[in-house]
């Protein structure tokens, strides 16, 4: 991990198209401005971790799930 020190108003460039800038320092909180192309997905770490967990949970299925879906789409005998 690269660790850098920045002062208020200073920035960091990532690649050719992302700039991070320190916009406010208040108490124990730092506000960071991010200038990046719209096609770049930017998430807070805790949100990204929740997205990953929910995607993993949604991708899990059991044979009971398959049976339930099958019973919904299979023609029922009369």
Curated annotation (Swiss-Prot):
User: What's a GO biological-process term for it?
Assistant: negative regulation of translational initiation
Recite the UniProt keywords alphabetically. Answer: Bacterial flagellum biogenesis, Cytoplasm, Repressor, RNA-binding, Translation regulation
Q: Name one GO cellular component term.
A: cytosol
Where does this polypeptide localize? Cytoplasm
Q: Which GO terms describe its molecular function?
A: mRNA 5'-UTR binding
Q: Which Pfam families match?
A: CsrA (PF02599)
Q: Which domain of life is it from?
A: Bacteria
Indicate where this protein is primarily found: cytoplasm
Please name the SUPFAM superfamilies in this protein's record. CsrA-like
Q: Which family does it belong to?
A: Belongs to the CsrA/RsmA family.
Q: Oligomeric state and partners?
A: Homodimer; the beta-strands of each monomer intercalate to form a hydrophobic core, while the alpha-helices form wings that extend away from the core.
Q: What is this protein called?
A: Translational regulator CsrA
State the species of origin: Desulfotalea psychrophila (strain LSv54 / DSM 12343)
